[in-house]
Amino acid sequence: MDNSAITSQSNPTPLVCSVTPIIVGSPPSPANVIELSSPSTPPTPLTLLASFSKTPSRKTTSPDSNGENTICHGVRQVRRVPRNNPGREKKSITGPSKEHKQRTRSPKTTTRREIKIVEGDRLIVGHDKREKKGATTKRMKKRDGVADKKLYARVSKVKSSENLDLDAKIPSSKVCNNTLPLVGDDMDNESSELQLEQAIKRRHDWTPAREVTTPVVDVAELHSSPCGKAVTRMHGVGTLLSDYGFSGVVETSLGTKSESFRNAPTTKRPMELQKFSTVPAIPTPTESSTTEDIQGSSSKQQRVKAKKPQKGKLTTITSHATAKYCVADQTVDLDYIQNVAPKSPGRKNISNRPSGMKHSNSGRGKSSTLKNDNGPPVFRVVPPLEAFKSFEGQELLFGTSSQLERGHPEYRCDETQDIQNSPSNSAAVSELAVPYRISSEGKNLGSSLFRLSGSKNLWSASARDLTGAVFEVDEIDFQEPSMGLSVLATKSRCHPGNRGPPRRNLVDVDNVPDKKLDIDTTEGENGNHSSVADNIVDRENLNPKISANTSETNLECAPRNKPAFSRFTTSELAKKVAAYGFKPIKSRDNMISLLERCWETQSKTFMPESKPNQGTDDARKNGFRKENHSDVRVRPDSATLANRRSPKKRQAKALSKFQEPNNFLPIENSTTTASMLPIEHVISSHTILINDDQLSDSVGETVSFLPTLDHNGNGTTLQENMLEIKSPATPNARHSRQRSSSTSFSIEPPSLASQITKAIKSQPRIRAFNGLKQPTWYEKILMYDPIQLEDLAAWLNTDGFGRIGEDREVGPGVVREWCESKGVCCVWKKQVSGRSHCLPMVS
């Protein structure tokens, strides 16, 4: 390092001597010999060099010609001169080994001085000769009064061995002095070596890594040297500047640290980073067998086993559908490799075996081999036939809208009635409309309505008894080899009394579609009828009436007086209730009230022209006489059996003119006919629902049988038997029945619920407006759209009821009850006032 830049602020040494200052710029003079020390204590060369920068007095010397160097108060201060200053000069002081010479850009002649330390007793300061270098010497002209100077010094006595050992310990760069360091010269010299200008530009794009090395300071050296603090300070400044130097070599190793940092005392434990960029390949069966013991012990120490998920049964449709896409959550470790690799049947899993256990344990290896149940189920594509069969065992959940769309029986019955109108399709109609079969070859007759016995759907679930239990389908065998069967079906309408609203507690059963059945009998005209004498039931008188216009006989009877059901015994009441097709009722009062309501209903529907016969009172006194309440058999007449078969044209004519069979009519002996045809009456226990305590909106249905006689001029003949099944409480049937009847009856208006349903279904489709579809109310219900009660009530009162000929009006409250009964999603219209909704009364 330059001698002019080495200073120190330490205390003055005891070897201070008077030194004559040398002023740069003075005229050349011969070398001066200065005595620096006494022979007893010879100074060191470093002390001699430091003494040249001090003056014996505190006088301030005059500045030189260039105004560069000044000496104030015994301390030399250096001031940097700008580059454009022509008087700037660079000085170099040669040390004991090298001689540095620098050339300035100033055109003036520079002065050089040298300090030569000669081993001896003298320090010689002398002049240096100018060196000439080609073209450069021409530009550098010497000024007057400026000359090169050299300093020569000689040590008076040789250093002792102790001082040499002390100097050898101190490095040459660690020079201490009492003066402050010369920052200017240090920056100039280091700027050329460190390339600070390039480093500053490079710093904008790159920040050097933080210094990871810990400087280690020799404690013994600090105690032995009085300038330990200065040495540490100089090293700190030097390393701070040298960190920003670019050596030209880029270190690629990450996380490398010097050995000195490992030995230095630290408070943090270094962490070793492991590279996971490469995953070990799946070993082959031969390789894994040789290395599985080593890998099993090492992998168990380096990883943590993940908690296995608990197995759960697939209970939802979503879990079944997404099971084949589920992937087990496992870590990338040896377990995952072993699961993917093919396993031999007798091999044991490495992850489940402890590290100390050897593979030679074959006995336990077999017991630990289990089938893999943790994986997702294997998805198997089934054939189409098996897939269709799976739908039969699937539990289907239907909403009320689906019932309204597909489950209502009137749609099927309408299709059946259209097919029945054609005579050629009588065989096909027999299988479509009738859920049971009647024949004389021994076939069973099912007693279900609307396919109740065939399929367990919502209609069968709705057939319940008084206790709430589901009805069981009863199958009655009507096999009778000695005679044929003649079946005609009607339905009975039972109106309640004067209790409650007029249409609220109505049990209304409409007509059923016609079904033509063949009549086969093997009995002769004069057959013996004594075997079925006990099966003849005298119910009420049959009044046949022959109409000249339609050539059709209508059999109607109307009792004059109401029977006193309270005088009947309990068994007689039970028989009468069973004759109407109801389930047995335990309460006597409930049976009496039910029979009275049924009698009133029949009396309203009877024709006023019908007249009772003589056997009416006898039938009431005798009651019912039959062995089986579900069978009603009547003997056929010989004349009737002779004329039993009629032409097909007559059958087709009777079928087209057949409007609706009368309601359930009790049968008793008639004076107009010698005998009666055998009739079997099927009374199903689940075909009608009547509540004991109160009759609700539940619709009861029954199947009754009525013979239809045609007049040929010679006598009465049984034409055919019809079975018609139709939706209960259908307004169309009521209107057609009212129009077809010869006389006007007193028929109460239909219920508002049925009228609302009819009005909603009768609404035509609306055309799209500006490309937007306008769904009808029925379509909104099927799409589960919320129905605003006020809007639906307004539409019914203005447009809906007008299409079906209904004059009444409904309010939002009635519409709400209808929506809740049908399961339709309904909401109130938002009102600004916020007052609560009240259910309006309907008159």
From Swiss-Prot:
<dbReference type="InterPro" id="IPR018574">
    <property type="entry name" value="Structure-sp_endonuc_su_Slx4"/>
</dbReference>
<feature type="compositionally biased region" description="Polar residues">
    <location>
        <begin position="349"/>
        <end position="372"/>
    </location>
</feature>
<feature type="compositionally biased region" description="Basic residues">
    <location>
        <begin position="302"/>
        <end position="311"/>
    </location>
</feature>
<feature type="region of interest" description="Disordered">
    <location>
        <begin position="603"/>
        <end position="655"/>
    </location>
</feature>
<feature type="compositionally biased region" description="Basic and acidic residues">
    <location>
        <begin position="617"/>
        <end position="636"/>
    </location>
</feature>
<feature type="region of interest" description="Disordered">
    <location>
        <begin position="281"/>
        <end position="313"/>
    </location>
</feature>
<feature type="region of interest" description="Disordered">
    <location>
        <begin position="26"/>
        <end position="111"/>
    </location>
</feature>
<dbReference type="GO" id="GO:0006310">
    <property type="term" value="P:DNA recombination"/>
</dbReference>
<feature type="compositionally biased region" description="Polar residues">
    <location>
        <begin position="603"/>
        <end position="616"/>
    </location>
</feature>
<feature type="region of interest" description="Disordered">
    <location>
        <begin position="339"/>
        <end position="377"/>
    </location>
</feature>
<keyword id="KW-0234">DNA repair</keyword>
<keyword id="KW-0597">Phosphoprotein</keyword>
<dbReference type="GO" id="GO:0006260">
    <property type="term" value="P:DNA replication"/>
</dbReference>
<protein>
    <recommendedName>
        <fullName>Structure-specific endonuclease subunit SLX4</fullName>
    </recommendedName>
</protein>
<dbReference type="GO" id="GO:0017108">
    <property type="term" value="F:5'-flap endonuclease activity"/>
</dbReference>
<dbReference type="Pfam" id="PF09494">
    <property type="entry name" value="Slx4"/>
</dbReference>
<feature type="compositionally biased region" description="Polar residues">
    <location>
        <begin position="50"/>
        <end position="69"/>
    </location>
</feature>
<feature type="compositionally biased region" description="Polar residues">
    <location>
        <begin position="285"/>
        <end position="301"/>
    </location>
</feature>
<comment type="function">
    <text>Regulatory subunit of the SLX1-SLX4 structure-specific endonuclease that resolves DNA secondary structures generated during DNA repair and recombination. Has endonuclease activity towards branched DNA substrates, introducing single-strand cuts in duplex DNA close to junctions with ss-DNA.</text>
</comment>
<comment type="similarity">
    <text>Belongs to the SLX4 family.</text>
</comment>
<keyword id="KW-0233">DNA recombination</keyword>
<feature type="compositionally biased region" description="Low complexity">
    <location>
        <begin position="739"/>
        <end position="748"/>
    </location>
</feature>
<dbReference type="GO" id="GO:0006281">
    <property type="term" value="P:DNA repair"/>
</dbReference>
<feature type="region of interest" description="Disordered">
    <location>
        <begin position="729"/>
        <end position="748"/>
    </location>
</feature>
<dbReference type="GO" id="GO:0033557">
    <property type="term" value="C:Slx1-Slx4 complex"/>
</dbReference>
<dbReference type="InterPro" id="IPR027784">
    <property type="entry name" value="Slx4_ascomycetes"/>
</dbReference>
<comment type="subunit">
    <text>Forms a heterodimer with SLX1.</text>
</comment>
<keyword id="KW-0227">DNA damage</keyword>
<keyword id="KW-0539">Nucleus</keyword>
